[in-house]
Amino acid sequence: YRRQRQMCIRDRLDAQYLVWLVVFLALAFDYINGFHDTANAIATSVSTRAIEPKKAIMMTAALNFLGAMVSTGVAKTIGGDIVMSASLINSAIISAALIGAITWNLLTWYWGIPSSSSHALIGGIIGAVGWSVGFDALNEAGIIKIFLSLILSPIVAMIGGYIVMKVLLLIFGRFSPIVLNDRFRSMQIVSAIMMAFSHGSNDAQKAMGIITLTLLSGGFIDTLEVPVWVKLCCATAMAMGTAVGGWKIISTM
């Protein structure tokens, strides 16, 4: 009986270590995501000299933190819409998904290639779950919804950018380029603020969803509500990563 009890305690400790490993990897993913995707928010503003690079990065870091704290809708989607049930996965599966996503992010950062951390994470989860448990464990409806958003995002943005540019040319086409540049620089700062805030409110929540899903599958929490400490940790990791800055990708952009 004593030996059996010792084995149970050891198994429980091993499970706890794996959960904390996932927490560490998820925060590492958030940190890397911060400096990997910083360019998305500030590349245009920096390239046109609307704002100094250091000021742009610090502004983006602060707004990423604030954005990460506003809601948990994306976190619940990541935590609840990809897998049919939290009981079907474990910390080892989630660790594999995170390691795959982190590796891809680091490679693309090293090569200076802009890429989506969201695509990497979603692909890592699907691959790890499909290999270890089987693709039947995946929530088909949830994955279709996520894939549609990933595919449609650049298409909708491209169409929106084309339409807005057409309208701007019709309104301001006759103005002097010098006058326009001065006025639009301030508007670029506003757009960078909006981009940074939305980046934090979207991307930081992916790590929140991963950690919350792990805590739920391990029996540490009872619902898919994101704990406050998870929000704070993910927001801080994202902000710190952003403060470091991804100069290679900014140069490419």
Could you tell me what each predicted segment is?
Residues 10-252:
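Multi-pass alpha-helical transmembrane bundle typical of ion/small-solute transporters
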Residues 1-9:
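Single conserved hydrophobic/aromatic residue that forms the stacking wall/gate
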